[in-house]
Amino acid sequence: MQEIDGSYGEGGGQLLRTSVALAAITGQSVRVYNIRAKRSNPGLAPQHLTAVKAVAALCRARTEGMEVKSQEIIFRPGPLRGGEYDFPIGTAGSVTLVLQAALPVALACGEKVRMNISGGTDVRAAPPLDYFRYVLLPLVYSMGARAKIEVLLRGYYPRGGGKVVVDVEPCLPLRPVLLNASEGLEGITGFVHISNLPKHIIHRMANGALAELSTFPTPAVGLEVFGKDDAIGEGGAVLLTAHKEHSRLGASAVAERGVPAERLGAEAGRCLREEILSGATLDIHAADQVLIYLALASGVSCFLTRELSSHAATTIWLLEQFLPVRFQVTQEAHLIRVRAKPEFNGMSSFLWR
């Protein structure tokens, strides 16, 4: 049984989610203790509990310690199975953080998987669903994955209630991806959406983003606005995407009470501008989230990023505990090169259990 100290590195929920995902994929039992020990509210929150339950359902796992505020769980995976699953978070907890754990496992199931997830689609301290759909998923698609996400209803803090349907086809091992050279910018797209808020807010958010990008020598910026998204409660978000030949860079911001709409749009614009100017092939958030997929590929992958977050460093450590993969991180001028090298032949004997 793997023993994982949940306080290691960044010591947050991502370590827990990735631990149970890797346990399910590899068939290794795991005990995770000191869960979220570095947070002001340690232990399992509802969204963490739902993520673990989602992975447990996909592999018929036997579990212990599965309750809110629990700081230790034991996860004993069984056989991976496809089918249709319902994963209600019950709060405004993030849908994308549940997907962060469940999607890699669904790819390994050997059968089609449909996941009906309810919760928060656009909440702070988590990737907005549109970032997951339009920045991260295209990268995973390029590695051979096939998944489709449909938003039936958006959900915001504090009410949640968003509804998302995710269809996944099995496809492990993934193809490696080489994003090891800076590329020219082909264009910038994006969109802003709001629900149950005055229309002027959406235009102020869009104008804030455009103002940040207007002095940047890029191709034309195509920004769409949507003011009638079906949702539970009030909220909104902006997503900006820079398109390169083989990769995308993303930046986003989620509306919050008391923060001017222009400032939120400008925040996303500044972040995207910084990513573009750095010459990175993946933005700092994609660099964090793509690591598990690189570890499940059939060959060497690499990318360039402007910063390696504590989440990413912790995930690299964790992946090397579960999988025969080695990561190499090197500083190259103002960029960081990350290289993932799986050290097994084709994954078949290891993953298809």
Curated annotation (Swiss-Prot):
Compartments where found: Cytoplasm
Enzyme class: ligase
An annotated GO BP: RNA processing
UniProt KW keywords: ATP-binding, Cytoplasm, Ligase, Nucleotide-binding
Source organism superkingdom: Bacteria
Entry's Gene Ontology molecular function annotations: ATP binding; RNA-3'-phosphate cyclase activity
Active site residues of this protein: H311
Keyword Ligase attached: yes
Entry binding sites for ATP: Q100, H285, A286, A287, D288, Q289
Reactions catalysed according to its record: a 3'-end 3'-phospho-ribonucleotide-RNA + ATP = a 3'-end 2',3'-cyclophospho-ribonucleotide-RNA + AMP + diphosphate
Family the UniProt entry places it in: Belongs to the RNA 3'-terminal cyclase family. Type 1 subfamily.
Function field: Catalyzes the conversion of 3'-phosphate to a 2',3'-cyclic phosphodiester at the end of RNA. The mechanism of action of the enzyme occurs in 3 steps: (A) adenylation of the enzyme by ATP; (B) transfer of adenylate to an RNA-N3'P to produce RNA-N3'PP5'A; (C) and attack of the adjacent 2'-hydroxyl on the 3'-phosphorus in the diester linkage to produce the cyclic end product. The biological role of this enzyme is unknown but it is likely to function in some aspects of cellular RNA processing.
Listed name of the protein: RNA 3'-terminal phosphate cyclase
Species assigned in the record: Nitrosospira multiformis (strain ATCC 25196 / NCIMB 11849 / C 71)
Organism phylogeny: Bacteria, Pseudomonadati, Pseudomonadota, Betaproteobacteria, Nitrosomonadales
Gene: rtcA
